Amino acid sequence: PHRPQDLNLAVSGQMVILGMHRSGTSSVGGLLKLLGAWPGEDERLLRGADNPRGHFELADLHMACVRRLQAVGADWRNPLAESSAAATDAFRREAALILQTLESRRPWFIKEPRLCLLARELLPLLTRPVFLHVIRDPVAVAASLAKRDGMPADEALALWEHYTREAFAASDGWPRLTIDYDALRSNPIAVTRKLHSELSALG
């Protein structure tokens, strides 16, 4: 994929939210929508009992990520490091069609926790994206995963670390911001103003 230094361009109005499951990425997606960014048509957005307010996540992108991991025998709880050219190519082809549907409404954003593992494979499809990393206390993430999925704490903490490392490695060198979910919950106005200011500064 291309590298940041290959693109001497202004930020393009493409945003990618990255964060581990149960880290507050849906809250940040809702916030971006309030700030004027587009997640796609409402009828295309994923909804579930675990997040009745909505995930602000394209259902077809979610399924593309699921299929990409399944293609190499992986899933969100068992994200194998192995890849294959065929799996990557199939994922990029599917993702390209999905992203094209957003292009008429910049600024737009995408989110799916599995993108922490797959964002690097999207880079050839993006112009000059901004990555928004959503960070939550890993102990709180583990507690949430235990409640939702019955996941043991040691597994949840190891998974949080893996997703977080992969996400920051994927965005290395690109425009990126970090959003503290706990700070957003405790002081939403200040965090929202800060996010708006930082995004405005990026163009």
State where each predicted segment sits.
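PAPS-dependent sulfotransferase catalytic core
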Residues: 1-92
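PAPS-dependent sulfotransferase catalytic domain
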Residues: 70, 74, 96-203
